[in-house]
Amino acid sequence: MPARRRWFENRPVLKRIVLAVLALVVLPYVLIFFYLLPFIHPVSTLMLRDLVLLRGYDRRWVSLDEISPVLVQSVMMSEDGQYCFHGGVDWAEMRMLVEDTLKGQATRGGSTIPMQTAKNLFLWNSRSFVRKAMELPLAVSTDFVLSKRRLMEIYLNIAEWGPGIYGIEAAAQHHFKVPASKLTRRQASLLAVSLPNPIDRKAGKPGRGLRRLAGVIERRAQGSGEYIKCIYE
């Protein structure tokens, strides 16, 4: 037996740690295939955190057919206009993000909906290069395995829309007292633009800046026909 392998075998604690880390790395890729099944309703790491801390949360799973199309249009135009055309990562956007970072300039988020979904399902919330490096292959794998419709359905059912508010049905009921299927264009656009910072951006009580952003997204959503074909064709 080589000396290096013998050294490793003689340290059972280290061996268990390495195996546990490997299992944690592989587990998300296994779960992606389980999420192909429509009756499985995934939860996010933030939901799990709330459960562990005994905070509780509100999430009511709904199928994509039970969500107003104007909400889907608004979210896509706000968060990922190229959703139907990339394979999980918008590499042109990522390239600009890296260039801005190297120049020391303020950077945009650059996260596609598959990237946000991978982060919400498997990773932590705070920004770091380590998280981003893990997020990219998970996003590509998620986009490859799941259909665009299923991926969007999962995203809209795990996204955070306020403290303890997860998923579009709970968000619509909490902010506007209507089901997700009955959201208006203005309500949908307000929910969409609150996604980057759902704790501070209150869709149900928007300030002037949020209303202005929502107006821009509302207009974009009305002309989004070509951009959403992968969802509704």
Curated annotation (Swiss-Prot):
- What organism, scientifically named, is this protein from? Rhizobium etli (strain ATCC 51251 / DSM 11541 / JCM 21823 / NBRC 15573 / CFN 42)
Q: What family is reported?
A: Belongs to the glycosyltransferase 51 family.
Protein name per UniProt: Biosynthetic peptidoglycan transglycosylase
Q: How does it sit in the membrane?
A: Single-pass membrane protein
Primary localization = membrane
Which InterPro entries is this protein grouped with?
Answer: Glyco_trans_51, Lysozyme-like_dom_sf, PBP_transglycosylase, Pep_trsgly
What cystine linkages occur within this chain?
Answer: none
Q: Which reaction does it catalyse?
A: [GlcNAc-(1->4)-Mur2Ac(oyl-L-Ala-gamma-D-Glu-L-Lys-D-Ala-D-Ala)](n)-di-trans,octa-cis-undecaprenyl diphosphate + beta-D-GlcNAc-(1->4)-Mur2Ac(oyl-L-Ala-gamma-D-Glu-L-Lys-D-Ala-D-Ala)-di-trans,octa-cis-undecaprenyl diphosphate = [GlcNAc-(1->4)-Mur2Ac(oyl-L-Ala-gamma-D-Glu-L-Lys-D-Ala-D-Ala)](n+1)-di-trans,octa-cis-undecaprenyl diphosphate + di-trans,octa-cis-undecaprenyl diphosphate + H(+)
